[in-house]
Amino acid sequence: MSESPSWMAKVEKIANDVAAAQGCVLYDIEFVGLGKGRTLRLFIDREEEGAISIEDCTNVSRGLSEILDADEEMIPGGEYNLEVSTPGLDRHLKKPWHFKKAIGKKVYIKTTKALESVGVEDKKWKNAKTVEEVLESADEQGVRFVVKDVEIKIPYAMIDRAKLVFEYTKGQKK
């Protein structure tokens, strides 16, 4: 991950506080675009299980807008749009707590090196740089999958990108 500008770190701290005041947690923040198309995007979630409502997004947006609009110098470069939403069904996983929340769900991970570099010897997996399987566990060091008796441990430092995989399951007819 790249270093954020210092103003972005300030905005992230404020966004964390505003989200917490609404009973939410800041899942991720990004600033994208150029000129009048610049957008500050916040993704909020619950630390534990539970859904984020439109009202939660609205309250966080209003609370943050109030603070940012009071100090026009906080975000350099003039106009920007503010978007507040949930991370979505196929959310990106970046922080250890994101992975912990995804335990028992299917995730996609792209690594920076082949899996043999972390001790995977299985013929099918040792040269792989991607895994799309159900996440068995996650801790502060990395993640763990077990696929047909093959254990795959991947440290966070080796993860290039990761996301939750949405699996559509068709409902049963009654």
Curated annotation (Swiss-Prot):
Subcellular location: Cytoplasm
Keywords: Cytoplasm, Ribosome biogenesis
Primary localization: cytoplasm
Top-level taxonomic group: Bacteria
One family name in Pfam for this protein: RimP_N
GO BP, one annotated term: translation
InterPro entries: Ribosome_maturation_RimP, RimP_C, RimP_C_sf, RimP_N, RimP_N_sf
GO cellular component terms, A-Z: cytosol
Family: Belongs to the RimP family.
PANTHER family reported in the protein's UniProt record: RIBOSOME MATURATION FACTOR RIMP (PTHR33867:SF1)
Function: Required for maturation of 30S ribosomal subunits.
Descriptive protein name: Ribosome maturation factor RimP
